Amino acid sequence: MTTPTILVATWRDGLFAFTGETAHQELAGQAVGALSSDGHGRALAIVDGHSLCLRAHNGAWSTIATSESQLSSSGVVGDTIYVGTDDARILRVSPTGAMDQLDGFDAVPGRDTWYAGSALIDGQLVGPPLGIRSITATSNGVVLLVNVHVGGVPRSTDGGMTWQPTIEVASDVHEVVAHPIDPDIVIAAAAIGLCISRDGGATWTLEREGLHALHCSAVAFWGNDILVSAAAHHFATEGAVYRRSIDGHGSLVPVGAGLPRWIDGIVDTRCIGTHASTGAVADRGGNLYVSVNAGGTWSRRTTGLSAPSSVLIV
């Protein structure tokens, strides 16, 4: 069995690849944002804000598309790559590498109520731009969902031609992820708790039981379970990661088993990665925690990562 590689992207210092006991840096000195799978065991990455790059199985990187727009996220449906921007647009990458804007996304009902998230810190208003934070599709490829921050989770069933809103805008969604096998199950991390859909993202229920705080920022599926991170707010000095069965209706419980009850800052959007029995969590403090036995035990793999932006296991 091939040992999986854990990729941890950072906003300022490239990307770090961990395979077994070895580790090395790639794209040094570059800003690497959202990572996503291309569906064939390779990684896609937003590099320096304007390039969509592909990592081959041997670790070599190539640029497959560029844009004048500030890029924020990507997702794949079949062989089609969709890219989100920091001005809340959706682009589709053509076979030639051109990025074509999906005009239908500009007509989402309620778009005029979207807003950029912000907070008052030391007398200054700070926060990310209004943008597309995550993109996902149901396992059968029928439904495309994007997480607008802040604008809910628009949903398309016709390849992005038309869109309908889901989840209240004020819920402040931070990440949306579709189940890798069951096309009905979708989860989202929001400032009001964990949101779960059992009809392909058409409707949602809110789960809060067991959380120490409601501000959820990252979600992932792992086998039959859901992982979700929570903190008091975006700038909290400590956070926690919880786990619960997809089919269960009980409390979310702290992961434990070597993953600290309180981690160093939040686990932000895209910073929980899972693949087979391997899981990885990167916190804002730059710690990377890894489990290779489906969460039976965890250990801290490294420290000092500079502003982690994304985790992907390939």
Task: Spell out what each predicted region is.
Residues 1-314:
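Extracellular glycan-interacting surfaces
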